């Protein structure tokens, strides 16, 4: 339902018409600040000025009509008491469209809810229109303008100069005007007025300043709240002129002659002589200012120096950056080199440790490579050479291992001193094995760790060790003088660990290979350690075990025992055996004794090794102990016939022991023999060597269990082979003693004297 126009509404038309003719400000903020009521509304309908209620729903816009406007938004400072969603009547001379939104700048009338337009309505969808209105219609937002102090400028004729006027405050934005000598300046060809920073400042710019432009300038800023002014001065320096001194009165050239002077020169006409002259700007000279005078050389030079300095700084920075980059690259290279060198040194150190002589289970010279074994799995690893003949180096029959600086004692026996002896260094090293009566045990097994050093003996400890070895050697010589002679030597066997080939393999500095002996000790027996100048040569040995020990049980197969004689206890061999047993086994008591050859053949041997590698059979291809030949008659011819045709025996894979079948054959041959081991003469031995007698195979490293089984077997002992043996006699006293013990049979060949 449409509301009827209020009474007296026709009287409003006069006021509306006046509002249409009122001047409007250029700034929207000025209009908003000037108008008493500012609202945003939507046109609901239009009515003619006569108040007729029969107008159509949609009518074209027309001036002098009354519009029904619904208030959508308002500003507190200019609300006029209106509320949102309220409908008011607005008389406007501007064309309006129904259902369109406008910002109305209104003035109240005498009638309530009836307003007239103060300024033309503005479309709120324009650029920042509503925002600009909000900036001015806020509390304490509108201020009068306040200008900053203007700086005076000084320039030369023809230069470009400008004066700047800037407002420090002012809302709405003020408008600017420039004045000189009380006259307002407008834009022209030589003068331009520019605005910047949202019309917050104004600039008066001269394209080419002239002498006439010098003077005082005034800038005025004004808004609806007030105005402010500021003053500034422009100074123009005069330049030299080419006017002749004799010239009279001069005046400026007319427009047609102004082009006579170039480069900003001012043309003058000299009356009287009717000649044109030019007033040249700074830096130019000549009749027409066509020459560059280099007047501003210092100024240009300053710019050039500044540019040169900047260029120099840039170059310095570039060179510094390159140097820093090279330094970083160098540091990275040095770090990488040091790291690589350290890794290479560690690798070489590991390789040297792997080649160190103290490394266990090192492969011996000329021997096959075996996998590394624990000390519990192997007692000794020996490698036998097939082409090296038996050497002349001998080893004493005592089984006590002697080393420098160590002593093993038992409560009831004498102490045994262990010192390594070496008499011929140019040939090879030999081991002197001595054994006291305290080292007697069937269940004892061991491995000795020995390493050969290559350093020179210069330290006091080494000199002391040499002195001890010399003293021990002289003591052993005295003890050997009182002992009966023994004909077989462990060194006579080619496969013996004390042979030249084996010892050289152990003592070669280039192929240092350790040989281990481990002794199982009782829990109550302490151990001791032998120290040497070289810490890598230290040897740890157990003391002597206080139990009984038989020498023959340690080396069961090194020598072939002789077959039994005609009867027990008869013959020179039996006497020698008794003498030997009484000397070495004083506490054995009465009972059956073993043959002398069996005991003598096993002295000085090392314990057997239970570890046998089948792949080594092709390398270690020596023969085992062959059975003795059939009984030889007393004549030399018969002995030659019986010694021919020796039979080879193949050894079995079980710890190098002979098979049971071979043992039975040897037993049958031994029973048929009519004489003992000691009945063979030197001539028979020579004949046996000429006929190719059997060469015994060295099996010195047999297991303890196999050795004990061989010793405790019921089969009679075998005689040792007579080939490739080295015999020795200790001295004249021992020779006489051996002749007394063996009256009937002749003695064997002379052996080498003294250990090597």
Swiss-Prot record:
The yes or no answer to whether the keyword Membrane is present is: yes
List the molecular function annotations (GO) for this entry. Answer: ErbB-4 class receptor binding; growth factor activity; receptor ligand activity
So which stretches are on the Cytoplasmic side? 337-756
- The Ig-like C2-type domain is annotated at 145-240
Residues exposed to the Extracellular side: 20-315
What are the residue boundaries of the EGF-like domain, all occurrences included? 249-290
Mark which residues the record calls propeptide. Answer: 1-19
UniProt keyword list: Cell membrane, Disulfide bond, EGF-like domain, Glycoprotein, Growth factor, Immunoglobulin domain, Membrane, Secreted, Transmembrane, Transmembrane helix
Basic and acidic residues composition-biased segments: 424-437
Q: Which CDD domains does the protein's record reference? A: EGF_CA, Ig_Pro_neuregulin
Q: Which residues form each disulfide bond in the chain?
A: 165-219, 253-267, 261-278, 280-289
What Gene3D superfamilies does UniProt report for this protein, alphabetically? Answer: Immunoglobulins (2.60.40.10), Laminin (2.10.25.10)
InterPro entries with a match to the protein in the record = EGF-like_dom, Ig-like_dom, Ig-like_dom_sf, Ig-like_fold, Ig_I-set, Ig_sub, Ig_sub2, Neuregulin
In terms of PANTHER family, this protein maps to: HEREGULIN-NEUREGULIN FAMILY MEMBER, PRO-NEUREGULIN-2, MEMBRANE-BOUND ISOFORM
**What's the protein here called?**
Pro-neuregulin-2, membrane-bound isoform
